[in-house]
Amino acid sequence: AEKIKICLQKQVNSSFSLHNGFGGNLYATEEKRMFELVKPKAGASVLNQSTWIGFGDSRTDKSNSAFPRSADVSEKTADKFRSLSGGSLMLSMFGPPGKVDYLYQGCGKHKVFYEGVNWSPHAAINCYRKNWTDIKLNFQKNIYELASQSHCMSLVNALDKTIPLQVTAGVAKNCNNSFLKNPALYTQEVNPSKEICGKENLAFFTLPTQFGTYECKLHLVASCYFIYDSKEVYNKRGCDNYFQVIYDSSGKVVGGLDNRVSPYTGNTGDTPTMQCDMLQLKPGRYSVRSSPRFLLMPERSYCFDMKEKGLVTAVQSVWGKGRESDHAVDQAYLSTPGCMLIQKQKPYIGEADDHHGDQEMRELLSGLDYEARCISQSGWVNETSPFTEEYLLPPKFGRCPLAAKEESIPKIPDGLLIPTSGTDTIVTKPKSRIFGIDDLIIGLLFVAIVEAGIGGYLLGSRKESGGGVTKESAEKGFEKIGNDIQILRSSTNIAIEKLNDRITHDEQAIRDLTLEIENARSEALLGELGIIRALLVGNISIGLQESLWELASEITNRAGDLAVEVSPGCWIIDNNICDQSCQNFIFKFNETAPVPTIPPLDTKIDLQSDPFYWGSSLGLAITTPISLAALVISGIAICRTK
């Protein structure tokens, strides 16, 4: 009889790369980065489709006769906007004659404003003021600020008021022989007498706590008054000095102008200019006192519930060729912390006409159709990778990637994986540091590792039989390192908050620190991933070694009395008793079934954070249990000896 020895032998050649891990090493035919770099998409997007609302005009108005050619958004996104062609929030606030007057109201955690162009220099609104850009800037800034602190907002288009009997609603020649709806102009018709100027005006208005279904915790009110260049211009009838002042219920001055105590401009001119300051006022009863002849009475407000902080996106709103625009929206964005601006790079070129349906704007606003994982001034991201090539400009919200270089992202083994023995990778002398990770976060943190060091992560689980680390202990190592990473990050945030408290007066210092912190977080995360990679490699190596023994056991069972196992993974067979077909049945499963495999490697890692990026406690979660790579028959050679 001819006896032969058949063994399982792992095939490794120069095409394999070696990967070291905690508890075991691997040879692999391929490797891949744990994450790829992502690139943000320019424009606007939202974190949650169910929690945002838009405020717009004809470019988001589905009722426009030229829709969808007139729109800069999709039909789906247009449904989320409160819009009317020709409208704007400021037009509805002041109500100039002949302009669209739309009741803007709605609720959402994230508010997108794409309006404003309908009140611009092209509109040529006069009413005692030819250039309203500075008032528009102040108005938009206050709208964005209050919207970022509220869930709901609404125009209040009719305030309760008490008007003095001696005044009547007036008009003005330089306001199309009409006047604004807010403020309303009231005048006194005075017959020649000793009191030729009439009497001082005293009126009252009430800011409600609720308007329809909308709760009002704070109102935006326009406090308007005339500015005279000199006392003589106003005092043509011997009316003394001009004043128009608003008082709260306690008698405190909250807005207006009083030339009895404040100087006139000193300029030369015969026509006054109207100025409107934006006041943030609580609900309640207010009084207005003015000098005789004129009374400018607040008639409208925007009310805000101030229930939750939210996100605000302002979209640049400009005309196409031939019409003059302003940049109040852009400037208001710069003045509003946490506000994101979507800005064109090219002139507006419309499809429906010169001013409606711009392709660039459609691309910039296309992200509103989707949910993003991260939105920022640099753009939006919906990929799951935690890294991007460039630093994302703040503000940013959601699960935003950190800046990193591609070569710094750890690589993991892929393709055909073959374990080493494992006996040469046991940690016998624990270290007191993990990759110096305590130095990664600009000296803010110190990581105290238990006396067992790395061995503590593997719970000191050396196999009694001599080599390797158990799969169970490696999995426990994942749990332990995950907990320590959470502690590390919690300590980071506490230190960051303390530093922020110390330098809140210095905005540039905050910006510099923010960048430093983000860079440190990126470095720390890369360090954490390096640890996880090493645990992954060790865990897979251990599992693959176990799978080899399982395969050997299966072969022994199939062979029965036809083969004798003389050492782990080696059998003696009588060639005369068990021919080639017999051997194929035993060792190749008669090629009718593959060698039992284990599920493929899944290294998906999900970085979780609060909806608001800064100050959040980042958490690291392995979303699925780490599984083992498949062993295929082509990865095993059968070595025969006589």
From Swiss-Prot:
It comes from the Viruses. One of its GO terms (molecular function) is sialate 4-O-acetylesterase activity. InterPro entries: Capsid_hemagglutn, Hemagglutn-estrase_core, Hemagglutn-estrase_hemagglutn, Hemagglutn_influenz_A/B, Hemagglutn_stalk_influenz-C. SUPFAM superfamilies: Influenza hemagglutinin (stalk) (SSF58064), SGNH hydrolase (SSF52266), Viral protein domain (SSF49818). In natural infection, inactive HEF is matured into HEF1 and HEF2 outside the cell by one or more trypsin-like, arginine-specific endoprotease. Keywords: Disulfide bond, Fusion of virus membrane with host endosomal membrane, Fusion of virus membrane with host membrane, Glycoprotein, Hemagglutinin, Host cell membrane, Host membrane, Host-virus interaction, Hydrolase, Membrane, Transmembrane, Transmembrane helix, Viral attachment to host cell, Viral envelope protein, Viral penetration into host cytoplasm, Virion, Virus endocytosis by host, Virus entry into host cell. Residues 83-297 are annotated as: N-acetyl-9-O-acetylneuraminic acid binding. Homotrimer of disulfide-linked HEF1-HEF2. This is Hemagglutinin-esterase-fusion glycoprotein. It comes from Influenza C virus (strain C/Taylor/1233/1947). The gene is HE.
